[in-house]
Amino acid sequence: MNFKTSAALLSAAIAVSSCVAPGPSQQTSMAPSLSRGPAVDGRWIDRNGIISTFQNGAFSTRSTDTNTLLASGTYVTISPTLYEINMTSLVRNTQSRVNCALVSPSQLNCTTDANSQFSLTRQG
């Protein structure tokens, strides 16, 4: 359905619904909204081909070639577009904090606690 058709149908529906007053037996039901995970959930890749996965508060990074776990940790949502990752590098045996900004649905710009910057691109 194209935009013009959708807009016309929506306008018609609003016009018709404004003509009908709800009676005492009619009840307005508010359907529960489906809970979705954070916007950052999913698989992301950096410019070196390293895959990072965000899933329900858990974070992991794996190599592309051997699927070796390189880092793992947790993340929290600071705002709808800001995320804080606390992770342990299994390669360096260090802990670090990374702040990431979701600048578009397909790009995360991140800064480590050592002020290194990198970007991740959503996969698939």
Curated annotation (Swiss-Prot):
A lipid is attached at residue 19 (N-palmitoyl cysteine). Residues 1-18 form the signal peptide. It is found in: Cell outer membrane. It is a lipid-anchor. InterPro entries: Omp10-like. One of its GO terms (cellular component) is cell outer membrane. Keywords: Cell outer membrane, Lipoprotein, Membrane, Palmitate, Signal. A lipid is attached at residue 19 (S-diacylglycerol cysteine). Belongs to the rhizobiaceae omp10 lipoprotein family. This is Outer membrane lipoprotein omp10 homolog. It comes from Agrobacterium fabrum (strain C58 / ATCC 33970).
